[in-house]
């Protein structure tokens, strides 16, 4: 006998809704970030030593020739774990804080900025230890560890605790919070603009059409994000690889800036634009596809 029972719909702004968005963030961020590990590896090494490779392609060739093809995925494990946790906090947190702040303020740019900043601040606390392992693994040759578990044990033993995992937390916040504020706010506004010029209203479009808008909006938002957050991204790489024992964050940042100058803050920008543009578009594609699959409205 055929059942006429309708699938249970997830109610907005319930615990189930936020748990679903959190899961969507994990699916959107962990696989996408780890899939571009080879690009990230070359970018990080060029940020630390701009003379190491003459181009990205030459970087890949040298890594494969000198270290083997598997080494282009150095840092994959730490990236996957770290950004899965970060994606959970970022997307789930954004949905929660956007709704919370909208009950206090009129919905709009201010709410998007506040919600994304709060969510990213908390998400980075989960990301930071794995980002530290990844950067150290990618910028030491040969890599100082074989995998994320090995890296965790070594860094914990070297510092005698959790201190080494969080020495880059302030630069990470400086990189990620502006990036995420730009990512979510520009995405929301770009998507709203796209919908405003299309012949159909969003509510009249099918899921595939809405997801296509999310993909385009995500790529455009990603380009802006890359430019906004790149100088801090360079400093995160430098501090994690070059900060001296017992050196304060401000002293380390000042010393590194004096060494590389303003232009050095933009090393690897074009790679990052391609990387972040692609990354952001696919994250929004995956996240909104997941939301549509479980019966939730897409973002924007």
UniProtKB/Swiss-Prot annotation:
List the transmembrane segments: 22-42, 70-89, 108-128, 171-192, 211-231, 260-280
Its gene name is PIC2
**An example Gene Ontology CC term for this record:** mitochondrion
Other remarks in the entry: Present with 2360 molecules/cell in log phase SD medium.
Kindly list the places in or outside the cell where this protein is found, as annotated in its UniProt entry.
Answer: Mitochondrion inner membrane
For this UniProt record, the keywords arranged alphabetically read as follows: Acetylation, Membrane, Mitochondrion, Mitochondrion inner membrane, Repeat, Transmembrane, Transmembrane helix, Transport
The name under which this protein is listed is: Mitochondrial phosphate carrier protein 2
At the top level, the lineage of the source is: Eukaryota
Start-end of each Solcar repeat = 16-100, 107-193, 209-293
GO MF entries: copper ion transmembrane transporter activity; phosphate transmembrane transporter activity
Q: Which SUPFAM superfamilies match?
A: Mitochondrial carrier
N-acetylmethionine PTM positions read 1
Q: What does this protein do?
A: Transport of phosphate groups from the cytosol to the mitochondrial matrix.
The record ties this protein, via InterPro entries, to: Mitochondrial_sb/sol_carrier, Mt_carrier_dom_sf, SLC25A3/Pic2/Mir1-like
Entry membrane topology: Multi-pass membrane protein
């Amino acid at each position: 006998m055929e059942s006429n029972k309708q699938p249970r719909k997830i109610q907005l702004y319930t615990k189930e809704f936020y748990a679903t968005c959190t899961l969507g963030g994990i699916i959107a961020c962990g696989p996408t970030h780890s899939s571009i590990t080879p690009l990230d590896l070359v970018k990080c090494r060029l940020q630390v030593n701009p003379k190491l490779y003459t181009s990205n392609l030459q970087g890949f060739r040298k890594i494969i020739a000198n270290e083997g093809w598997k080494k282009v995925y150095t840092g994959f494990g730490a990236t996957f774990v770290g950004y899965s946790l970060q994606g959970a906090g970022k997307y789930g947190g954004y949905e929660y804080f956007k709704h919370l702040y909208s009950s206090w303020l009129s919905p709009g740019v201010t709410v998007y900025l506040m919600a994304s900043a709060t969510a990213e601040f908390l998400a980075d606390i989960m990301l930071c230890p794995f980002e530290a392992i990844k950067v150290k693994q990618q910028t030491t040759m040969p890599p100082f560890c074989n995998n994320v578990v090995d890296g965790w044990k070594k860094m914990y033993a070297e510092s005698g605790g959790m201190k080494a995992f969080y020495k880059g937390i302030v630069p990470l916040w400086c990189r990620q919070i502006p990036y995420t504020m730009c990512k979510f706010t520009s995405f929301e506004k770009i998507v709203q603009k796209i919908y405003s010029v299309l012949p159909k209203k969003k509510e009249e479009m099918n899921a595939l059409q809405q997801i296509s808008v999310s993909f385009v909006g995500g790529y455009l938002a990603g380009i802006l994000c890359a430019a906004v957050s790149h100088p801090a991204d360079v400093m995160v790489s430098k501090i994690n690889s070059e900060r001296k024992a017992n050196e304060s964050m401000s002293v380390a940042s000042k010393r590194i800036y004096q060494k590389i100058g303003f232009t050095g803050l933009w090393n690897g920008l074009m790679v990052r634009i391609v990387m972040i543009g692609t990354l952001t578009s696919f994250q929004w594609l995956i996240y909104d596809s997941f939301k549509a699959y479980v019966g939730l409205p897409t973002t924007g």
